């Protein structure tokens, strides 16, 4: 049985007049007066569907073929022939069609041929990958993931899996999910009973506080200080109640860490990474991107093509603040030296002032994490954010503080104890080395390359406050 995919056939990898077997789902069925049915078949291998010609001589034509509706799964044996239509150059004449799965009640099937809003599709996240848009997003996500792995491997980086359950707060924030088993059985027995918050972890699984990770960075640093170049690519969690199109409670991060690298080194690495993976995306997923041009954003191809060639602007945080203070714009969030940049500030700089990606360096230490290297002015840290038009911040990074005395000072300033970070301090006690790294928010990258406006539509099953239905 010569099983092939739709993309194999449409790309010309299978010769005409070849008998093949193809499996997939029905997108649409059209019947002609000549007792011929035209079936559009998709299997997820590409954005396009394949036309299947079903003649009435098929043994199950009347009883089954004429009952096929959108979503039915089938396995088809047929011959590839030249198409007489203009939509595609080949089609398949069916010799046998076996129905694997019916739609129980087509009138209640949530995914019909008509156009659905993205809001509606979120309510049926388990079925939305059957739509062209979400299918395209999934393939783009896969291609970007592979491109990131390949780029970093070629640069000599080693992939390291870091813990999802952790005892450390990487960012020094309170927006963490606690992991506890102390009341698990009670909740399982009575799901409607509220959890009684307690700080007593004596009888808990780990006998101490545990959290879902907000970053794999600290663990990656440990391996970078032995293997030189490492990266982590995995899920991270933030207990943020922000109900915006830019925030998720669960999202994916790419976090390279490299020994002997400075802030300037990782800026070069980050810019090169972004340009490389977008160039590969244009090469490998042109059909999916062209589809999104028609459905989502007509300018997305131009934006991506320009991205690979455009020069990133570099400015100091202090300079960025001056630009924001003197611009003729009234912001909702007042800005002055020492405050962090909000989304409106980031978008003004990248979309209106520079009209291109911009890298902001050397932020005040009071608005950045404890692990960032203190600059000689004792006011700022060796940090950087990369802003892109339409998104704002897409990458954040820094040179890490390799000096134990300075690290202890920063821990104290952030009301963090040396005891909780004992192993992280050990990295400075035993053969410390300058090292740097950054974090790339994968879903924000997905928003940029697809033109989709809501971050909940570029991840398979979005997790947000009061939303965990799947």
Swiss-Prot record:
Pfam family membership, one: tRNA_anti-codon
GO molecular function: asparagine-tRNA ligase activity; ATP binding; nucleic acid binding
EC assignment: 6.1.1.22
GO biological process per UniProt: asparaginyl-tRNA aminoacylation
Record field: catalytic activity: tRNA(Asn) + L-asparagine + ATP = L-asparaginyl-tRNA(Asn) + AMP + diphosphate + H(+)
The keyword Signal belongs to this UniProt entry's keyword annotation: no
Cited PANTHER family: ASPARAGINE--TRNA LIGASE, MITOCHONDRIAL-RELATED (PTHR22594:SF34), ASPARTYL/LYSYL-TRNA SYNTHETASE (PTHR22594)
Full protein name: Asparagine--tRNA ligase
Organism: Blochmanniella pennsylvanica (strain BPEN)
Lineage: Bacteria, Pseudomonadati, Pseudomonadota, Gammaproteobacteria, Enterobacterales
Gene name of the record: asnS
